[in-house]
């Protein structure tokens, strides 16, 4: 085809110049050609067509005559001709084509007719004809004055055309002109059921969205169409502004409830973040099996409902929602996959593959920094497996290979290994609580918090163990216990925990770091709840701090706590932004931007992204400042306080673009392109933040283009860009065991063998890549990427915002912040149970998810599938469906824990 096209073009361009030297000739030749064309056209008409054309012309003439008795039969005949013309999909039906030249004449005839049935008939015919004319909505105009007979008789194309005109007309009428909207509504009430019955559900939805009457859908939907309609509505949510998006979700939710599809309705209620509605859906369902399935969904999303004890199977439901069985189910999967054998960091580094000239990297093996890296790697790789080779056998030996804060993080990594195992885990950590070293004790406290992350326990062991240390004399002890509480109760909005923590911020003994961590912990506990006490306490703390204190790098956690408290709440932050106006620069811009981006997290709000791009394009005169900064840093390397940086909020803006756009794919693609520009042309502050933004937009989804970009910048001249790029590579591939990434990181480890900081980052990235031996994910989205877990986003943000000052926080003494990732860790598995919650292995097909929105029929939802037996792992962008007819899933999205029922129609 292409070649043909290529051959044609030169011929066309030569034609006029070869045949017609002057412009005048060209015109005349054009005219001749047209005349010839018309003659051909007449010859082209076959006998039948000629007969039809004459017949139609005769009918039109008959309507122009004086004899009114002939009108009726003439109109009847015209109507019959138009209707009976079987139309092909690509061309205009013949009668309409031949009647087109008579359109004006027919309108005149209509105007001159006496009112009555004939006039209405004529209006109907003109309305259908108007489809072929690009007129001023005449199709609709004549329909409204026509005979009002049913639409279906004129065919689908006519209905579609009419719907388009109704939508345009509606938008031009104001609310004042209600009377004129009535006839349009009547028409809509005819169009919608017609579309529903003829597989054009999405057209019905579009029309109702245009005229803002989505609620009308509910009564026209039948059992066969509801799934498609709701899929279409929920897919549109990303592309409509507030408050229409919630209206669409509520409409789809109403439809699901009408057909008693409780799990689907619950998912939408969670998208709306409306807890009363969630509770209402949960309690109004009377089927215990479905309730258990919903409890699994709530547990995965980190929502716990206080049920009344007289609910049937109260204990089971509470246990499922509390994620009590998460650990045992995860270990069952590990046994199934045969990966229980603990791994040591060297299995991950694969040092034997490095072709070092000096035979292994022997010289610097036992440095404290490398041991710290190994503690993290060991924790990440064996996360939730409950056993390892460094800490669970004889931990003291390993702990004392670390120094000071290194001991804190090393002890805390034990919590990660025992993740979710509250009963068994705490007994193993207990012995370290009696250590003589404050750092080890503090790490053990943090470990207690980590073990409880995402799991609720009646006895509240985390609160009981950690509460005594929150106001301890030693700030080190405070850090472990406060951050531990933040992780253990993230997303619970528990008042008793918050009342315990809030006073610490204002306590005179609290260092800036402790105040920051407290704000962070409170933000995580109250995530997305707009808790008034948290807001006022953090604001008060910010107001009370002096300008010098706010320049401390840990001050960044105060506004982050505020932002997390309002995560995804949109406009609810106006008052806070106003309150922050009194704070001095540069902290004010930093805090404002941070709170603002948190409020719109995952919303895909394009206008916000535009504002953030404006912030990124501001230019500060930073030449002198950069020089000062270098001198100052040489002078006081040990001093934590980095000089005030006017562009600090730009880094947050870059992260914010990723945070807002990560919710939907088109936005994420566009953000990706923007990041490319920023990396090439941005200021240093921007460039340091871009790798982190790339990590956030593609967590646990190792796309090659992103990995290549990060790999390029992992050799950047600015050390902070390279630190962040290397860590981002780990985030992008977290829990995937991606072989290509693992090879890249091994090469980097060789390249940076002499640079302890970069090597530390490479080790962290290697640990993350093999997170949970490849069974866990950090991606905050689940349920087919529809639901965003706020707790997971809070954990990721905590880490990424800290990485904006990687040198003083992560490579300084506060690497324990990396345990914020625990809040985002989730197994990426699919486990199936029978109605009694016994594991039920069935065969499932796992393949790449295909978007089937608005497609006719029942298209395949996955492609390139393989058949496995559950439990199975699901990678990013994969979807599973049952490969057997024997069972029916209680929820349509097979992810996490799914209950199956016997199919009553299955014949053995």
UniProtKB/Swiss-Prot annotation:
Gene Ontology cellular component terms for the protein in this record: proteasome accessory complex; proteasome complex; proteasome regulatory particle
Keyword Lyase: no
Skewed-composition ranges (Polar residues): 10-22
Database matches in InterPro entries: 26S_Psome_Rpn1 (IPR016643), ARM-like (IPR011989), ARM-type_fold (IPR016024), Proteasome/cyclosome_rpt (IPR002015), RPN1_C (IPR041433), RPN1_N (IPR040892)
Quaternary state and interactors: Component of the 19S proteasome regulatory particle complex. The 26S proteasome consists of a 20S core particle (CP) and two 19S regulatory subunits (RP). The regulatory particle is made of a lid composed of 9 subunits, a base containing 6 ATPases and few additional components including PSMD2. Interacts with RPGRIP1L. Interacts with CRY1 in a KDM8-dependent manner.
Sites bearing Phosphothreonine, chain numbering: 9, 20
PANTHER family: 26S PROTEASOME NON-ATPASE REGULATORY SUBUNIT, 26S PROTEASOME NON-ATPASE REGULATORY SUBUNIT 2
UniProt lineage: Eukaryota, Metazoa, Chordata, Craniata, Vertebrata
Disulfide bridges in this chain: none
UniProt region (Required for interaction with UBLCP1), positions on chain: 708-903
Organism: Mus musculus (Mouse)
Protein name: 26S proteasome non-ATPase regulatory subunit 2
Residues modified to N6-acetyllysine: 551
